[in-house]
Amino acid sequence: MKQFNEFYQKIATNRLGHWLNTLPAQLSHWHESELHGEFKHWQKTLDALPVVDANSAIDITNTVKVGESGDLDQGQFKRLENLMKKFKPWRKGPYHIHGLHIDTEWRSDFKWDRLAEHISDLSGKYVLDIGCGSGYHLWRMRGAGAKFVVGIDPTQLFLMQFNAIKHFIDDSPVHLLPLGVEQLPELKAFDTVFAMGVLYHRRSPIDFLYQLKAQLVKGGELVLETLIVDGDENTVLVPGERYAKMRNVWFLPSEKAMCAWLERCGFNNVRVVNTDITALDEQRKTEWIDTESLQDFLDPNDSSKTIEGYPAPKRAIFIANA
């Protein structure tokens, strides 16, 4: 795909150049044998997106917004809306594209607001976001001054959603690759690595933490957000078949247990900068998804519990240095 060739050209002349030893072969294999059955339809939808005045105002500092509501006539606006809805479900956002409000399931801006004041200045930094979804936070990282932003997520619909937004922003230092963390070599090249909402999906959280550490420069910063439970340093919840209707949830540590894991893996200066119970105004059903959302995952008679009887989702943000 053309976008990957552009990425190769970019990293050939920067500190990520050694990634070229493995990445092209991985993405070539992905493109030849692992494409989703709907991928060609998504690509046609992407190709049909309108080309709007390149001088449109772009704001990725305070939100992710391109242009204004008067940029398109009624017919153009409706066509844009119909095309973007072909990429449903939209999980993470929101986005504002020429007056179109993509009201995603998650208000990912809430999470950004919780962490932004605690992280190191991103100005001039190389940043990696692992499990980045459709890339909402990639744009906010760029808006915060990052020099080069890379997101990885193996879900192909997220790649197409990212490409749809990038069609209107076209900010070349922001990239999304359809990879899982296990496919990354030890790059040791990023100043800041974000891993938000991923750890509890990993069968081996300790291996995952080592994988994160292997992407950071010496002294680089890890920003990790994950589900937690109350308890001491020995408290870890291992749910049964499902947690909040999710099948792939493996480990929910306490704050102290998570800190101990990070320290055991060689991170230092470990601290918790925020804890927050996920609220119904942060994750909810909208017209941009066709599935259930948080309200459906909680006990209808006791919102402090999941429908399975576990503690309701509570998240913490940890920051540490490699």
From Swiss-Prot:
InterPro entries (UniProt xref): CmoB, Mo5U34_MeTrfas-like, SAM-dependent_MTases_sf
Top-level taxon of the source organism: Bacteria
Cited Pfam families: Methyltransf_9
BP-aspect Gene Ontology terms: tRNA wobble uridine modification
Keywords: Transferase, tRNA processing
First-level EC class: transferase
Catalytic reactions on record: carboxy-S-adenosyl-L-methionine + 5-hydroxyuridine(34) in tRNA = 5-carboxymethoxyuridine(34) in tRNA + S-adenosyl-L-homocysteine + H(+)
EC number annotated for this UniProt entry: 2.5.1.-
GO molecular function terms listed in the Swiss-Prot or TrEMBL record: methyltransferase activity; transferase activity, transferring alkyl or aryl (other than methyl) groups
UniProt-annotated binding residues for carboxy-S-adenosyl-L-methionine: 92, 106, 111, 131, 153-155, 181-182, 196, 200, 315
Protein family according to the UniProt entry: Belongs to the class I-like SAM-binding methyltransferase superfamily. CmoB family.
Subunit record text: Homotetramer.
Function field: Catalyzes carboxymethyl transfer from carboxy-S-adenosyl-L-methionine (Cx-SAM) to 5-hydroxyuridine (ho5U) to form 5-carboxymethoxyuridine (cmo5U) at position 34 in tRNAs.
Annotated HAMAP family: tRNA_carboxymethyltr_CmoB
Matches recorded under PANTHER family: METHYLTRANSFERASE, TRNA U34 CARBOXYMETHYLTRANSFERASE
Protein name, entry field: tRNA U34 carboxymethyltransferase
Organism: Colwellia psychrerythraea (strain 34H / ATCC BAA-681) (Vibrio psychroerythus)
UniProt lineage: Bacteria, Pseudomonadati, Pseudomonadota, Gammaproteobacteria, Alteromonadales
